[in-house]
């Protein structure tokens, strides 16, 4: 710690406590000498030699035809088998005999060969050896079973016969343990019988199949017949329902035509009663109104008819009475409308040009619904419905029209010319009040307005 550190010069104004770094002279780096690259030697490409054409393949030589084979030597024909006896045709309806199993058949036709002991009686004379044919064996077995021959003492077996196999009717206990030897003929018989039984079974199975097919066909035919009958019944029911529907339509058409004829007669009578005056447009409107009324009445009649058909007899009679009342009421309304229309036509016919123009303006004029709604709400102090405002607008239109017409008549009475004055309107309003023809929203007019 003996070394002293240099003190910083505080008096120097530009000293910041850090010594300025002296720029180090960069050593000139030695430039690397780059050795020039040797120019690449361009290789001269040798032209490729054309390939030699491939040798064409020689056509294959046709194969040598194989030596004709030697004809086969025809084998010796087998001796024709003995024809089988014709089968007895069995009735299909006869009961089937109980079939015997193969074991039972083998037990019946088996031949047990045992050397008889000395002193035993010889076998029955009808027994045959193993070389006998099928027919002789069957006949011998049947005769031996049916008529057994009685043994005799004199018929003793010779030494040559004792070595042969003989048939014994009842085998002894020693022979019971030995296996029975079956002859070839017995095997053939068994096979033939099995074949016959199999053929019979096949025939019976075919007969059963035929019976089943016949029964199935009968069932199908019956089902088809039943289906056809059901379809016929459905068609009959549909035709009946169609006929009922047509009848009801005819009734409705008749009622509609009757009502039309009534309306036409009534309109003709009304036209005759009137002066016969009126424009073509008004007559068309009258006919349209009458037709609409008649159509409404026809609709009500048709509805009432459909209701009366569904109800009982008493209800139908009451419904007919109600329908008559409805017809009378609609008839009265149509009469009133026709009279009013005829009166209007007569008045319009006598209008002057000025009156016709004023009438057209009157028809096309209307009050604003918003203004009428405000007036009604201020009077009633309650919200007003849109429909009520429309109705009140129509009433106001009629009321104002009456006042204007009355004021014009008053102006003519006073023999004044010019437009309508307020005094004319006041006089008209006074006269309407006296006649109690001022519209009001209540039934009775208040005393203040009288």
Swiss-Prot record:
UniProt entry keywords in alphabetical sequence: Nucleus, Transcription, Transcription regulation
Quaternary structure and interacting proteins, as annotated: Belongs to the TFIID complex which is composed of TATA binding protein (Tbp) and a number of TBP-associated factors (TAFs).
Coiled-coil intervals: none
Full protein name: Transcription initiation factor TFIID subunit 11
UniProt organism field: Dictyostelium discoideum
Family statement drawn from the similarity comment of this UniProt entry: Belongs to the TAF11 family.
Gene encoding the protein: taf11
GO MF terms held by the record: protein heterodimerization activity
Low complexity bias (residue ranges): 103-117, 126-152
Biased amino acid composition, Basic and acidic residues: 17-97
Compartment(s) of residence: Nucleus
Main function: TFIID is a multimeric protein complex that plays a central role in mediating promoter responses to various activators and repressors.
InterPro entries the UniProt entry points to: Histone-fold (IPR009072), TAF11-like (IPR045127), TAFII28_dom (IPR006809)
């Amino acid at each position: 710690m003996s070394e002293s550190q240099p003190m910083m010069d505080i008096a120097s104004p530009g000293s910041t406590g850090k010594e300025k770094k002296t720029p180090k002279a960069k050593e000139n780096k030695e430039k690397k000498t780059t050795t020039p690259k040797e120019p690449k030697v361009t290789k001269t490409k040798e032209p490729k030699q054309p390939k030699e054409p491939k040798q064409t393949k020689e056509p294959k030589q046709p194969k040598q035809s194989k030596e004709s084979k030697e004809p086969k030597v025809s084998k010796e024909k087998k001796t024709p088998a003995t024809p089988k006896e014709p089968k007895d045709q069995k009735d299909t309806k006869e009961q089937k005999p109980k079939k015997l199993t193969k074991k039972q058949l083998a037990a019946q036709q088996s031949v047990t060969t045992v050397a008889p002991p000395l002193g035993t009686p010889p076998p029955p004379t009808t027994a045959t050896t193993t070389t006998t044919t099928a027919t002789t064996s069957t006949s011998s077995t049947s005769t031996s079973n049916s008529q057994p021959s009685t043994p005799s003492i004199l018929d003793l077996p010779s030494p040559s016969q004792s070595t042969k196999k003989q048939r014994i009717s009842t085998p002894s206990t020693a022979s019971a343990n030995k296996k029975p030897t079956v002859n070839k003929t017995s095997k053939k018989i068994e096979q033939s019988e099995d074949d016959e039984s199999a053929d019979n079974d096949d025939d019976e199975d075919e007969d059963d199949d035929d019976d089943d097919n016949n029964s199935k066909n009968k069932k199908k035919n019956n089902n088809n017949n039943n289906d056809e009958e059901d379809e016929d019944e459905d068609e009959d029911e549909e035709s009946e329902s169609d006929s009922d529907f047509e009848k009801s339509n005819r009734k409705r058409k008749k009622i509609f035509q009757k009502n039309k004829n009534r309306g036409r007669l009534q309109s003709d009578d009304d036209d005759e009663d009137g002066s016969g005056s009126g424009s073509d447009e008004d007559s068309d409107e009258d006919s349209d109104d009458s037709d609409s009324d008649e159509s409404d009445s026809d609709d009500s009649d048709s509805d009432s008819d459909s209701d009366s058909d569904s109800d009982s007899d008493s209800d139908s009679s009451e419904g007919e009475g109600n329908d008559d009342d409805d017809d009378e009421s609609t008839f009265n309304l149509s009469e009133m409308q026709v009279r009013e229309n005829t009166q209007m036509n007569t008045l319009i016919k006598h209008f002057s040009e000025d009156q016709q123009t004023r009438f057209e303006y009157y028809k096309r004029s209307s009050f604003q619904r918003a203004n009428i709604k405000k007036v009604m709400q201020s009077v009633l102090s309650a919200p007003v419905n849109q429909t009520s405002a429309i109705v009140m607008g129509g009433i106001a239109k009629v009321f104002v029209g009456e006042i204007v017409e009355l004021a014009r008549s008053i102006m003519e009475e006073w023999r004044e010319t010019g437009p309508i004055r307020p005094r004319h309107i006041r006089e008209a309003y006074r006269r309407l009040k006296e006649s109690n023809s001022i519209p009001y929203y209540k039934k009775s007019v208040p005393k203040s307005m009288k």
